A protein has these predicted regions:
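Surface-exposed extracellular loop regions of Gram-negative outer-membrane beta-barrel proteins
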Residues: 133-134, 139-153, 252-256, 313, 410, 435-480, 501-519, 635-649, ...
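N-terminal periplasmic accessory domains that precede
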Residues: 37, 67-70, 86, 106, ...
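Outer membrane beta-barrel strand-and-loop segments of large Gram-negative receptors
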Residues: 338-340, 380, 386-388, 475, ...
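Short, acidic, small-residue-rich periplasmic hinge/interaction motif at the N-terminus
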Residues: 20-60, 81-82, 122-123
Length: 694
């Protein structure tokens, strides 16, 4: 551990103190780019106020199997071996696009390296994506030709239920493109160990529940997508896409607990079974029309309708008498309908671009619920409207993007109706320092609506005298975020140092309260506020100036506080971290990933992020790729939760999936392409709300 920490500190020192001047990039510029580049004289990168633009040399293009391999080399992206998808080393949500249209992992795989022109990496997403993602990666490809691509990928553990599989095919003829995709992620673990403790005072007595449980749990997620595109260059683009998401999950748990009330000790038996499933069909229609050389109008409509079935049966009894302590039999049938519509217009001026639009999303949920309080029927409706406009341009050495929006959140349930309009401004400024360095500043303000589980009226028994429920009276949060970023890029280094500060008013906080019917309830409140500040250092170091050896690092010393509704101040300091070491040589590649989990605030609790200690490699032979790896070397995947000192209930939980310990993975993939497929520049990307299951 000491060696690991020393290595991390050494790399931090290298990032901060190393600089080099290299020759200027050769990316073409246009008079009316959305944001002109801050001058960074790097071979492969140009830094803009809200994004970085990457190109790739001949060696990188020849080694890559597909575009996904190229994107993986970006300094703040890494391959998640568990899901076999790309993610940000900084965490958060990453959205991938191909020529402006939202793309799946398989679509990125279907792009040959020779077709890649450049990659736009937005660490400050534009208005149309700002509410959906923390990072946006846009893959720009060359013009279309008639052709076809297809491929398949399968990865499986040798000693437990872990399978990732996918297949895709695309065919292009003239102005028409047809695409078909299928993916499956299966998990089936029979040895998850869970240790939980509840400790509290109630009615003058001291209670303690010490639980040990072994679960058999798993899930299967499948997706089928069919896509048709017609693109007429310089005129219009039409796309129709049908998605079908199929998801099932189950938990079968047995165990025991030691229940203590003052000096009385009882041995309890426990059982908990639960399951959930849904099938979600989604239709996505998109149309874009060039009204003139300077004007473009885009329309996007997305709709879905489906039913989610959720059951949970939990009981606890005294051993050996069999006397029941509690029985929790919950059955929830949820009918959910969602629709999203967006209209956007872009006008190009000599000085920059003006983008304006309107997006509306509406989700209606009808619930038939049988739980501890009996049977009930209730409906909720979540409506959100977003008007936005932003202008981007350049004045001398300053690059800027200034935006203003108006957001309406209207949440309605049987118990409460919440309606709020919020002004949502955003300012981004970029300034060239010299050579390969730049400074950027971004400031924004936006509301965040409560999620469906937080607003739910459902009640679930967690332990004797402990239940969990939502709060239909929650209001939206208001986040004010600021980032001041220093960037350095040369042949060996590509990193950002981000000084950040976030203030959230009416932060949604989970906490325990006294409940007259059940003892204590874990529920939600609008706390007064929260603050988070720190420095995030992220990027990559290439000691040889190529991909023979690459070290990627993310280190974030930070502090966070929550001021509860009763005035109590909760504080936590942490050092988030992530380390990736990779190597590429001819047809071989090898990667090692490591982190040290840290506790961060999550409502009334401190929770750790998922631990990682993975190594995996691949060998490429023409269209075939052979993969092998070991995940969670010497350790199970582990998740920890503990309550704060201010909590009425002292709670802790340690969750370990023993099946994952030193899990050996083997895989194979095949990817073939001939010609090029149709790609379009879609300006709008939307999706309906995820399934409500609480």
């Amino acid at each position: 551990m000491k060696k690991t920490i020393c290595s991390v500190l050494f790399l931090c020192g290298i990032f901060v103190f190393s600089q080099e001047n290299v020759k200027k990039d050769t990316i073409d510029t246009t008079k009316t780019a959305e944001i002109q580049e801050v001058i960074l004289k790097a071979q492969r990168k140009k830094q803009f106020a809200d994004k970085a633009v990457y190109t790739f040399d001949k060696e990188a293009l020849e080694k890559a199997r597909y575009a996904k391999d190229l994107i993986q080399t970006l300094p703040e992206l890494q391959l998640d071996p568990i899901e076999n998808t790309l993610k940000s080393t900084k965490g958060g949500t990453t959205l991938f696009l191909i020529n402006g249209i939202e793309a799946t992992d398989m679509q990125i795989r279907s792009v040959a390296p020779s077709e890649v022109v450049k990659v736009e990496y937005y660490d400050i997403p534009p208005a149309r994506w700002a509410t959906r993602a923390d990072v946006v990666v846009n893959l720009i490809t060359r013009s279309t030709e008639t052709g076809y691509v297809f491929g398949a990928d399968a990865r499986s553990a040798l000693n437990t239920g872990f399978v990732n599989g996918s297949a895709y095919a695309n065919f292009t003829k003239g102005k028409n493109n047809f695409g078909l995709e299928y993916s499956i992620n299966l998990r089936d673990y029979n040895n998850r160990k869970v240790h939980s403790i509840y400790d509290y005072q109630l009615d003058g007595s001291h209670y303690r529940t010490d639980e040990n449980k072994v679960d058999h749990f798993g899930y299967t997620y499948q997706n089928v997508a069919l896509r048709y595109t017609r693109a007429v260059p310089d005129d219009y683009t039409f796309q129709a896409k049908m998605d079908l998401d199929m998801y099932t999950t189950f938990v079968k748990g047995n165990g025991g607990s030691i229940f203590t009330k003052d000096g009385l000790i009882e041995e309890h038996g426990m059982l908990k079974n639960s399951s959930s499933n849904y099938t979600t069909p989604t239709l996505d229609l998109y149309f874009s029309k060039n009204l003139s050389k300077k004007d473009e109008l885009s329309i996007n409509l997305v709709g879905s309708s489906f039913t989610t079935s959720t059951t949970e049966f939990a009981k606890e009894w005294i051993v050996p008498s069999g006397i029941s302590v509690f029985d929790n039999d919950m059955n929830l049938q949820t009918k959910q309908t969602g629709i999203v519509g967006e209209l956007a217009h872009v006008h190009t001026f000599e000085a920059g671009k003006l983008s304006s639009g309107y997006r509306v999303s509406n989700t209606n949920i009808s619930n038939d619920l049988q739980n501890l309080t009996g049977f009930s029927e209730y409906s909720v409706n979540y409506l959100e409207q977003y008007f936005y406009t932003e202008f981007s341009g350049k004045v001398k050495k300053f690059n800027y993007r200034i935006g203003a929006g108006l957001t309406n959140i209207h949440n309605k349930s049987a118990e409460n109706t919440f309606d709020q309009w919020s002004f949502t401004p955003k300012v981004i400024l970029g300034y060239q320092l010299k050579d390969n360095q730049s400074l950027r500043f971004a400031s924004s303000y936006r509301p965040i609506s409560p999620w469906s589980a937080a607003l739910s009226s459902n009640i679930v028994q967690m332990a004797p005298n402990i239940v969990q429920r939502g709060n239909p009276f929650l209001k939206s949060q208001q986040m004010f975020a600021n980032n001041f970023i220093y960037s350095l890029n040369n042949k060996y280094f590509d990193f950002n140092a981000n000084l950040f500060y976030r203030y959230t008013d009416k932060i949604i906080n989970q906490y325990y309260v006294l409940d007259e019917d059940f003892g204590y309830a874990l529920t939600y409140e609008n706390a007064k506020n929260s603050q988070q500040f720190g420095v995030q250092v992220s990027g990559s170091y290439k000691p040889f100036g190529n991909n023979l050896l690459v070290a990627k690092l993310n280190v974030t010393p930070a502090s966070e506080t929550i001021r509860t509704s009763n005035g109590a101040l909760i504080k936590n300091n942490y050092l988030a971290n992530n380390f990736v070491l990779s190597s590429e040589y001819k047809s071989f590649s090898l990667q090692y990933q490591l982190n040290i989990p840290v506790y961060t605030l999550s409502g009334a609790f401190l929770t750790t992020n998922e631990n990682q200690n993975h190594i995996f490699g691949s060998y490429k032979q023409k269209e075939w790729t052979f993969i092998a790896g070991m995940y969670w070397i010497g350790m199970p995947s582990e998740y920890k939760t503990k309550s704060l000192p201010e909590s009425l209930v002292n709670y802790s939980r340690v969750n370990r999936i023993m099946n994952n310990k030193s899990m050996l993975i083997l895989g194979i993939s095949y990817d073939f392409s001939k010609g090029k497929k149709t790609n379009l520049e879609k300006k709008l990307n939307n999706s309906t709300a995820p399934a409500a299951t609480f």
